[in-house]
Amino acid sequence: MPKMKSVKSAVKRFKVGKNKIKRGSAFRSHILTKKPAKRMRNLRTAKYVHSTNVKAVEKMLGI
């Protein structure tokens, strides 16, 4: 049986570390002038995928 292919868009969006999956923040692409600097600073930091979504992301990544 051939190897399962990973979803390429998921490979570009997620990074796998020690038992956790990192993701970038949303709401940073446009209409940024009305968003406060504090909010933009907080959105720059990477987040972890929520426990309810981990199984789906792992399936997409082929883990």
From Swiss-Prot:
Protein name: Large ribosomal subunit protein bL35
Biological process, per Gene Ontology: translation
PANTHER family recorded: 54S RIBOSOMAL PROTEIN BL35M, LARGE RIBOSOMAL SUBUNIT PROTEIN BL35M
Keyword presence, Nucleotide-binding: no
Family statement: Belongs to the bacterial ribosomal protein bL35 family.
Gene (name only): rpmI
Record flagged with keyword Magnesium: no
A cellular component annotation (GO) from this entry: cytosolic large ribosomal subunit
